[in-house]
Swiss-Prot record:
Recorded name of the encoding gene: IFIT1
SUPFAM superfamilies in alphabetical order: TPR-like
Superkingdom to which the source organism belongs: Eukaryota
UniProt record similarity statement: Belongs to the IFIT family.
Effect in UniProt of substituting residue 46 to A: Decreased capped RNA-binding. Decreased translation inhibition of viral RNAs lacking 2'-O-methylation of the 5' cap
Residues that, per the record, bind mRNA: 147
Cited SMART domains: TPR
PROSITE patterns named in the record: TPR (PS50005), TPR_REGION (PS50293)
Source species of the chain: Homo sapiens
Official protein name in the record: Antiviral innate immune response effector IFIT1
Residues noted as binding RNA in the record, renumbered to the chain: 190, 259, 289-290, 336
Modification comment: Phosphorylated.
GO-annotated biological processes: antiviral innate immune response; cellular response to exogenous dsRNA; cellular response to type I interferon; defense response to virus; intracellular transport of viral protein in host cell; negative regulation of protein binding; negative regulation of viral genome replication; negative regulation of viral translation
Length: 478
C-alpha cells in the first residue's frame, strides 16, 4: 500500500510533464458531449497525419467523464498508432502519451504503474540530453499541445496559435505547424469578422499551409472561405472544386464547401452537401447549425420574392422553412448548450414563427452566457432590444439593451446598428412628447457617439433646462 510520501513524490513529478493533464485545457461541462462527438468524428472521417493526438484527447475527455478504463484503451490506441505513424519520432511523440498514462494511473491509485511511465519519460529525456527530468521542450510536443488546445474551443485558440507559432519561428517550412497555425488564425479571424477596422491575418498563413500540405482538402476549403471573405470568390471556388474532387476528408470538406455555396447564394447546392455530411456525422453541431442557416436563407428568399407578403403556396413554403430552421437550430443547441450564435439564430427564428414565449426563453439563456467574443454579447443585446421594441412593444426595455450593446465599446457593425436603433426610437418618442427629459438626454448621448458635438451639446442643454424648470416647479408648488 502506497504512503502519502509516495503519492506526493509522484504528483510532483507528474506536474512537470507536458501532456493533456498539465496543459490547462479550458472545457466547460456543457461542452463535453459535443467535444467528444467532434473527437470521434475526427477519428473516423478526417484524414490526417496527426491522429495520435486526437486519441490522447479522447482519453482525457473519457477521464473527465469518469470513464478511466475507456481512457486507458484510447491511450493504448494512441501508443499503437505512434509506432505506425512516427517511427523516426516515436520516442519524442510518445512522451505525451506516456505522460497521460502516468496521470491516468495516478488518478486510479496505481502509483507503481504511474512511476513506470514516469521512468519511460525520464529515460528518453536522458537519452536526448534534455536538461529536465520529465519535461521536453521540442517542436513535436508544441504541435501536440497546439492541436489539443485548438480542438477544445474558442477560449483556447490564442494559446493554440502561440504553440504553432513557436515551432514556425524555428522551422518556417514545417507542414504540421503551418497547418495548425493557419487553422488557428482562420478561427480567430472568424471571431472578428463583424469588427470594424479588423485586418484579417489568416489569408497568407492559409496559402502557406496549402503549399506545404497540397493534399489537405480541409485547409483548402478554409482558404476558399477566407478568399470569399476578401472578395476573391472566383479563386476560392477553384480550391473548393479541388477539395471536392479529392476523396480525402470528404465529410469535413462538404461542411465548409456548403458554407461557401450558401454565402454565394447557391443554397440548394449547399443543402445537398450538408445532408450528405449529416448522414455520416448525425450529431455534428456545426452541420445542424449550417443546415438551419440554409433554411433561413431560403425563408429570406421567399420573403424578398413576395415583398414580405407571402400567400398560398409561398406562405406554406415559408412556414416549412421556418419549422426546418427551428428544428436544426434546436438540434445544435441541444447538443451544445453553450453555442451562443445558434441560440441567437434560434431566438430570431422563433420570432419569425410568432412564438414570442420561446424567443424570450432563448434570449434569457443568452443573457446568462459569457461569450468568448465581446461582439457576440453586442449581437445578443441588439437583437433582444429589437425584440423588446417591435414584438414586446417595450421602449423602456429596448433602450436598456441598446445601451448595453453600445456600452461594449468594441467598434463593430452591431454597435453602429445599436446606436442607429436607439436614435430612431428616441426621435420617435420625442415626436410623441417633445419635452421628455430622458429622450433629450439620450439623443444628446447618441449625437456624442456619432461625433456631432454641437448637436450633442444642444440636446444636453435642453435636457438640463427642462430638469431645472421641473425642479423650480416642484419647489414653487401648485
Amino acid at each position: 500500500m502506497s504512503t502519502n510520501g509516495d503519492d506526493h513524490q509522484v504528483k510532483d513529478s507528474l506536474e512537470q510533464l507536458r501532456c493533456h493533464f498539465t496543459w490547462e485545457l479550458s472545457i466547460d461541462d456543457d461542452e463535453m458531449p459535443d467535444l467528444e462527438n467532434r473527437v470521434l468524428d475526427q477519428i473516423e472521417f478526417l484524414d490526417t497525419k496527426y491522429s495520435v493526438g486526437i486519441h490522447n484527447l479522447l482519453a482525457y475527455v473519457k477521464h473527465l467523464k469518469g470513464q478511466n478504463e475507456e481512457a486507458l484503451k484510447s491511450l493504448k490506441e494512441a501508443e499503437n498508432l505512434m509506432q505506425e505513424e512516427h517511427d523516426n519520432q516515436a520516442n519524442v511523440r510518445s512522451l505525451v502519451t506516456w505522460g497521460n498514462f502516468a496521470w491516468m494511473y495516478y488518478h486510479m491509485g496505481r502509483l507503481a504503474e504511474a512511476q513506470t511511465y514516469l521512468d519511460k519519460v525520464e529515460n528518453i529525456c536522458k537519452k536526448l540530453s534534455n536538461p529536465f527530468r520529465y519535461r521536453m521542450e521540442c517542436p513535436e510536443i508544441d504541435c501536440e499541445e497546439g492541436w489539443a488546445l485548438l480542438k477544445c474551443g474558442g477560449k483556447n485558440y490564442e494559446r493554440a496559435k502561440a504553440c504553432f507559432e513557436k515551432v514556425l519561428e524555428v522551422d518556417p517550412e514545417n507542414p504540421e505547424s503551418s497547418a495548425g497555425y493557419a487553422i488557428s488564425a482562420y478561427r480567430l479571424d472568424g471571431f472578428k469578422l463583424a469588427t470594424k477596422n479588423h485586418k484579417p491575418f489568416s489569408l497568407l498563413p492559409l496559402r502557406q499551409a496549402v503549399r506545404l500540405n497540397p493534399d489537405n482538402g480541409y485547409i483548402k476549403v478554409l482558404l476558399a472561405l477566407k478568399l470569399q471573405d476578401e472578395g476573391q470568390e472566383a479563386e476560392g471556388e477553384k480550391y473548393i472544386e479541388e477539395a471536392l474532387a479529392n476523396m480525402s476528408s470528404q465529410t469535413y470538406v462538404f461542411r465548409y464547401a456548403a458554407k461557401f455555396y450558401r454565402r454565394k447564394g447557391s443554397v440548394d447546392k449547399a443543402l445537398e452537401l450538408l445532408k450528405k455530411a449529416l448522414q455520416e456525422t448525425p450529431t455534428s453541431v456545426l452541420l445542424h447549425h449550417q443546415i438551419g442557416l440554409c433554411y433561413k436563407a431560403q425563408m429570406i428568399q421567399i420573403k424578398e420574392a413576395t415583398k414580405g407578403q407571402p400567400r398560398g403556396q409561398n406562405r406554406e413554403k415559408l412556414d416549412k422553412m421556418i419549422r426546418s430552421a427551428i428544428f436544426h437550430f434546436e438540434s445544435a443547441v441541444e447538443k451544445k448548450p453553450t453555442f451562443e450564435v445558434a441560440h441567437l439564430d434560434l431566438a430570431r427564428m422563433y420570432i419569425e414563427a410568432g412564438n414570442h414565449r420561446k424567443a424570450e426563453e432563448n434570449f434569457q439563456k443568452l443573457l446568462c452566457m459569457k461569450p468568448v467574443v465581446e461582439e457576440t454579447m453586442q449581437d445578443i443585446h441588439f437583437h433582444y432590444g429589437r425584440f423588446q421594441e417591435f414584438q414586446k412593444k417595450s421602449d423602456v426595455n429596448a433602450i436598456i439593451h441598446y445601451l448595453k450593446a453600445i456600452k461594449i465599446e468594441q467598434a463593430s457593425l452591431t454597435r453602429d446598428k445599436s446606436i442607429n436603433s436607439l436614435k430612431k426610437l428616441v426621435l420617435r418618442k420625442l415626436r410623441r412628447k417633445a419635452l421628455d427629459l430622458e429622450s433629450l438626454s439620450l439623443l444628446g448621448f447618441v449625437y456624442k457617439l456619432e461625433g456631432n458635438m454641437n448637436e450633442a451639446l444642444e440636446y444636453y442643454e435642453r435636457a438640463l433646462r427642462l430638469a431645472a424648470d421641473f425642479e423650480n416647479s416642484v419647489r414653487q408648488g401648485p
